[in-house]
């Protein structure tokens, strides 16, 4: 597992209060991890801060799974 994946999963566990073993790359933030729209906004902000990337609203709307977040961050981080 990549460093990005580990860090994304850690943020998800901290922000959503879910068990780490539930945070798989295929997990949907809403359907599998119980996030609501406010949680998603907070996760996106945490990803931006942690990785120094900007995630515009149109891109954030397409990030629905853990792997979506990892892929976006890997493709856009400095």
Curated annotation (Swiss-Prot):
* PTM remark: 4'-phosphopantetheine is transferred from CoA to a specific serine of apo-ACP by AcpS. This modification is essential for activity because fatty acids are bound in thioester linkage to the sulfhydryl of the prosthetic group.
| O-(pantetheine 4'-phosphoryl)serine, modified sites | 37
MF terms (GO), sorted A to Z: acyl binding; acyl carrier activity; phosphopantetheine binding
Task: Tell me the InterPro entries matching this sequence.
Answer: ACP, ACP-like_sf, PKS_PP-bd, PP-bd_ACP, Ppantetheine_attach_site
Where do the Carrier domain residues begin and end?
A: 2-77
**Which keywords label this protein?**
Cytoplasm, Fatty acid biosynthesis, Fatty acid metabolism, Lipid biosynthesis, Lipid metabolism, Phosphopantetheine, Phosphoprotein
Keyword Phosphoprotein attached: yes
PROSITE patterns in the cross-refs? CARRIER, PHOSPHOPANTETHEINE
Matching Gene3D superfamilies:
ACP-like
- GO process terms (BP): lipid A biosynthetic process
One Pfam family here: PP-binding
What is its subcellular localisation? Cytoplasm
List, alphabetically, the GO terms of the cellular component aspect.
Answer: cytosol; membrane
List the pathway annotation: Lipid metabolism; fatty acid biosynthesis
Q: Which NCBIfam families match?
A: acyl_carrier, PRK00982.1-2, PRK00982.1-3, PRK00982.1-4, PRK00982.1-5
User: What role is this protein assigned?
Assistant: Carrier of the growing fatty acid chain in fatty acid biosynthesis.
Q: Which family does it belong to?
A: Belongs to the acyl carrier protein (ACP) family.
What is the official name of this protein in its record?
Acyl carrier protein
Source organism (scientific name):
Novosphingobium aromaticivorans (strain ATCC 700278 / DSM 12444 / CCUG 56034 / CIP 105152 / NBRC 16084 / F199)
**Source taxonomy lineage?**
Bacteria, Pseudomonadati, Pseudomonadota, Alphaproteobacteria, Sphingomonadales
Q: Quick one: which gene encodes this?
A: acpP
